[in-house]
Amino acid sequence: MKKITKLETERLFIFPISLEDADFVLAVHNTPKFIEFIGDRNLRTLEDAENYIKNRFLLHYEKHGFGNCLIVEKSTGKKIGAVGIFVRDGLDVPDIGFSFLPEFEGKGFGYEASAKLMETVFTDFGLEKISAITTNENIASQNLIEKLGLKYVKMIRLPDDDVDLRYYEK
């Protein structure tokens, strides 16, 4: 099976998230915007983050060859965000998601990383469609999703969730 190993853009390296990234996963999952717009994943310790990586990210990657990826700024070597393509219950089309540490938001990294990952899954994995979901309140994500060429389709609700989400597709 084909697997994403390393992607590169002008300013970024993009790698599958590994156990060595537990400190970053813990930090980004506990930012106020992540909790508000994506949800509280109850990651409170490094061990919680390691288990989350093992039980969610690594299993998804092994099954599909793609999943959640770490975004590293080339010029500094800093871990700045994550971008991923996910096969998710309740969605017929894999969806793209992204998150950043607050100090790296609004610099175009989300578009750069997401566009590269989308290009890769369309070309190398034969995906014909991609989707995205976000809340009504998350205007920044809506803007990025639309900039990536996805179009709003409808409001949806994922299984076992009580939040209405905007559903986009390309």
Language-model segments: what does each one mean?
Residues 33-55:
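Conserved GNAT-fold acetyl-CoA-binding loop/helix
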Residues 1-37, 68-170:
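Acyl-donor (CoA/ACP) binding surface of acyl/acetyltransferases
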Residues 57-70:
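A short helix-loop-beta-strand connector motif used in the catalytic cores of GNAT acetyltransferases and
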